[in-house]
Amino acid sequence: MDKVALKRKLLDAVEARADDIIAAGDWIWCNPEAGFKEYKTADYTTGILRDLGLEVEENIGLTGVQAKINGRDDRPNIAVIGELDALLIPEHLESDPDTGAVHSCGHNGQMANMIGVAMALVDSGVMEHLDGSVTCMAVPAEEPIEIEWRRELYGEGKLFFLGGKQEFIKDGYFDDVDISLANHMATNTEWKIAVRGGEGPQPGGVGFMGKMISFKGAEAHSGAAPWNGVNALNAANIAMSAIDAQRDTFKDTDAVRVHYFITKGGDAVNIVPSEVRLEMMIRAASVEAIKDASMKVDRALRGGAIALGAEVEISNIPGYLPSQMQGSDALWRSMRDNAFEIFDEEDLVVGTADPSPIRTPHGAVSDINDVANIMPKASFGVGGATGVGHSRSYSIVDKYVAYVMPVKLYAGMVFDLLWDGAKLARQVTEEYEPQVTKSGYMAYWKDILEG
């Protein structure tokens, strides 16, 4: 069977599984779980992959799952990534009544996409004609939430990072992966699939580091003798004002964002607050900008403590690396070519390369950036949702677009990358220059945290 016929067989296998793929997306939507707690979703995914006859590895990064589909060679190995976790938005009408979890970022769609790829590759039998392998990865905890609880897991030695992909990297599960493919859902779009245009580097997402901050003062009676206390809340307020005063020093091109909230503001209104805790994220477009902002923030925090005679404890937490968008032009071309081959042109939008010298990345973060720093990665946008992402208004309104169409693009790319001795995949890996080596990843993060 020639290339065209085999590829058509693969795409037809996706269409034949459309109802099953949609059912998977619906099941995961109805069973949302926050990061590192996705036990039901992991079990559900494991069951489907095993029913396909695949050998499944479980409990990676606590709840992660992966299964490898072998072709004629073990390498190159392409990872198709789906994210297991949901957000916590109890105001959403379809959130879990007990936990408040809901898939208001569309990760249930990613999981349906990844499951669909496994179904189509196995059903079609095309891997017998392809020179490489595909690893279907279900990764936990993309959303950096419940940080205090995750720090408890760190203290227990169960985690080092906040993100599931980072745990996969740390534990070596990306060591035999050569290329990664991912996507993300958008809302209120006229298009159905969005692919990157242009050549060369383009701005992507920012990275971040986290901070857990504790101001320590001394309690006293708020009304009778407040002068006998040291007000930790006042120290925190001065520190936050000092951080705000630093914002003019952040370059626009660095896309710095410093945001925080108070997780403990005191114990009682008639007691001078003796301990105040904050949770903070520092986002920026480069590691250097993250370090610079972190230094300025720490200075402000210490200044607030000194002003009130309090003490402050600052714990730096590894976040996610900034995106490296230079990647591989051959990989981006493969994505565009497949999109136009498989879909109607009116269903697509192609991003254009930004010719301006000032190119500001968007402010969202994801641990897929860490993957993109160590290997070639391509992501595309998916429509089919409405409302505001990360909010109570989010919903999926076109399940075929959200759940099935991305499977076809993944399938087409995998086929082309591994066809004919995997020439295209090998070109992609030869073009790519890693920003961080897999073996040096942990040391790189430790250097960031130490400033």
Regions found by a protein language model. Give the residues of each.
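Short glycine-enriched loops at secondary-structure junctions
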Residues: 82-87, 186, 206-208, 263-266, ...
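Metal-dependent amide/peptide-bond hydrolase catalytic core
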Residues: 2, 234-451
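Acidic/His- and Gly-rich active-site-bordering loop/insert found
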Residues: 2-104, 108-135, 140
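Divalent metal-coordination and catalytic microenvironments
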Residues: 28, 67, 80, 107, ...
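Histidine/acidic-residue-rich, glycine-tolerant segments that coordinate divalent metal ions
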Residues: 92-102, 108, 124-259, 267-271
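Structural motif
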Residues: 76-79, 133-135, 178-181, 347, ...
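Non-cysteine beta-strand/loop elements that form the S-adenosyl-L-methionine
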Residues: 79-81, 90, 211, 216, ...
